[in-house]
From Swiss-Prot:
Principal subcellular localization: cytoplasm
Sequence similarity: Belongs to the ferrochelatase family.
UniProt KW keywords: Cytoplasm, Heme biosynthesis, Iron, Lyase, Metal-binding, Porphyrin biosynthesis
Originating organism: Symbiobacterium thermophilum (strain DSM 24528 / JCM 14929 / IAM 14863 / T)
Protein name as annotated: Coproporphyrin III ferrochelatase
Annotated localization: Cytoplasm
S-S bridge residues: none
Keyword Lyase: yes
Highest rank taxon of the organism: Bacteria
Signal sequence, renumbered to the chain: none
Length: 320
């Protein structure tokens, strides 16, 4: 079989929980048109003149609270996913590489490594279950730019999404069932997804529909459990997808729901948005509003059922 490789891609992370490391990461991330599509002449002066002066120290302090002995949580868990999938695919001689859309290891460096190995068939697997132009399309763009100039282009297979993949849903089901068995049934389960600007969905991004399809599939598996969804991590003043997760939580308290469990099905690996925004900030707000118990259910990370999903996504694209 021709040399086949899988490139796993997640969003990215600063190299250290310090302002000087956060600043270039945010510059690359927020400077990407796929993320913020405002005219460059309008947006870049705001980004470099205000945001990159103010936000890095604040963001660095948050990273310091969640940083692991192994380093960045997102990178650590992504490497565990890479290693677990590599072990599954090793017998077929398939190599698994890891790249980040922003920061290191970059998509370009991962592809250069695979080029040196002699890759002839490349499967790109963005670690975003629900497609969005802000994430998945950004991966596509990075891959094409990195391959620009290669005279020995490999065959490319790009896996767009997997919002209702049976093995992905099996992981979500097991995570929720395990929680209920250990901690008891919550008054409500909140599924929180990263928000995006409403203008993006209006222009064709089907992210919201995919988030709803994942939520509906989870509801089908737990018909007796109250399940609501929300969107988190809004940035800027433009209208973003709603309802906001923090408002959903406040409304649950107002309607007598004192015990909630919160899960983020759109995040394949725990990161700043889950480990701090969801697990810490929203928990504090929930209790302050009158809630009594708030539990965050961890992301997939290297859970075997999620690795089953990644393996299946790869194997279905291999030659028979």
């Amino acid at each position: 079989m021709e040399k086949t490789a899988v490139l796993l891609v997640n969003l990215g992370t600063p190299s250290a929980p310090e302002p000087d490391a956060v600043r270039p990461y945010l510059a690359e991330f927020l400077g990407d048109w796929w993320v913020i599509d405002k005219p460059r002449w309008q947006w870049l002066p705001i980004l470099h003149g205000i945001i990159l002066r103010v936000r890095p120290p604040r963001v660095a302090k948050i990273y310091q609270k969640i940083w692991l002995p192994e380093g960045s949580p997102l990178l650590h868990y992504s490497r565990l996913q890479q290693a677990a999938l590599q072990q599954r695919l090793e017998p077929e001689g398939i190599r698994v590489a890891l790249g980040m859309t922003y920061g290191q290891p970059s998509v370009k460096s991962a592809l250069e490594e695979l080029r040196g190995w002699g890759v002839r068939r490349l499967l790109v697997l963005p670690l975003f279950p629900q497609y969005s132009s802000t994430t998945t399309a950004a991966v596509w763009s990075k891959v094409q730019k990195a391959l620009d100039g290669w005279r020995d282009l490999p065959e490319q297979i790009f896996i767009r999404d997997f919002p209702t993949h049976p093995k992905y849903l099996a992981f979500l089901t097991e995570r929720i069932s395990g929680y209920i068995a250990e901690k008891g049934r919550p008054d409500a389960l909140v599924l929180s997804y990263h928000s995006i600007p409403q203008a993006y969905t209006a222009s064709g991004d089907d992210y919201a529909a995919q988030c709803e399809s994942t939520t509906d599939a989870v509801r089908d598996r737990f018909p007796d459990l109250k399940i609501v969804m929300g969107y988190q991590s809004k940035f800027g003043n433009d209208p973003w997808l709603e309802p906001a997760t923090d408002e959903v939580l406040r409304e649950l308290v107002r309607t007598g729901h004192r015990h909630v469990a919160v899960m983020a099905p759109g995040f394949a690996a725990d990161c700043i948005e889950t480990l701090h925004e969801l697990e810490v900030e929203y928990a504090e707000e929930f209790v302050k509003a009158g809630g009594e118990r708030y539990d965050y259910l961890p992301a997939a990370n290297d859970h075997p059922l999620f690795i089953d999903c990644l393996e299946d996504l790869v194997r279905r694209h291999l030659p028979r």
